């Protein structure tokens, strides 16, 4: 499975709230940098899973990837994601040894 295929499977498992599958795409030492009004850095698989599960608790929102671009080595993937409300983010995923080791997420637009 290529990194882009893994990323789309990762997105699918997030939308399905299949945390068992979701966590298999993450390195134990993954970091997630969330850039909004402030910067938050979440480190480690456990912290990442805790943060994402809290965000989706009792929240049925789904998202889709509207654009992506791969680096020549396919280890970096830039995405534009849009949720059901029209909120946008630019997320950059970094892969090492077939796992996501870093995500930088820029919150771009809140729906009106």
Label each region the model flagged.
Residues 9-10:
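Generic hydrophobic alpha-helical segments
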Residues 16-33:
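Short, well-ordered alpha-helical segments enriched in acidic and aromatic residues
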Residues 31-43:
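A short gly/proline-enriched turn/hairpin at secondary-structure junctions
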Residues 33, 51-112:
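A beta-strand edge to alpha-helix "cap/lid" segment located at domain peripheries
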Residues 2-5:
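Alpha-helix N-cap/N′ positions at the starts of helices
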